[in-house]
């Protein structure tokens, strides 16, 4: 398998990690699914997977790529609130559909999910 196919396969697992394990609370779940409905290019995750292929375990490589995407997405959601943006990537922004408070809270939820993954990556085995 060539390295680009391997990266694509790993990106699938990154996406699965990001979209999985969402809180059962209906309103949070609805907004979270809305934010991650499109796959996007995942350039940050791609770069992480490529650069970390030298010395990282597969589990941590995928988790680190997911962390980067989650942190990036959380900053975009918060940025839309601060800038009072109506659209992000051609779609209505969270704060435009729901409210600024929803945007801040879901951004914080996404940050928290990333931090939980960070703690897991940092555990001594």
Residue positions per predicted region:
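Conserved N-terminal diphosphate/IPP-binding helix and adjacent helical/loop segment
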Residues: 1-73, 77, 81-96
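Well-ordered alpha-helical segments within folded domains of soluble proteins
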Residues: 43-49, 107-115
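A generic signature of intrinsically disordered, low-complexity regions enriched in glycine/proline
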Residues: 83-87, 112, 124
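Divalent-cation-assisted or electrostatically stabilized phosphate/pyrophosphate-binding catalytic cores
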Residues: 88-112
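Transmembrane helix-loop-helix
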Residues: 116-125
């Amino acid at each position: 398998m060539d390295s680009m196919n391997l990266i694509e396969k790993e990106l699938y697992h990154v996406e699965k990690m990001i979209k999985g394990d969402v809180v059962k609370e209906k309103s949070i779940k609805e907004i979270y699914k809305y934010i991650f409905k499109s796959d996007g290019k995942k350039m940050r995750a791609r770069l992480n997977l490529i650069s970390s292929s030298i010395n990282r375990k597969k589990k941590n490589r995928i988790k680190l790529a997911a962390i980067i995407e989650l942190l990036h997405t959380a900053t975009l959601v918060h940025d839309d609130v601060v800038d009072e943006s109506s659209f992000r990537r051609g779609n209505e922004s969270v704060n435009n559909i729901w409210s600024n408070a929803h945007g801040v809270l879901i951004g914080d939820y996404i940050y928290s999910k990333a931090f939980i993954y960070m703690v897991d990556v940092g555990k001594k085995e």
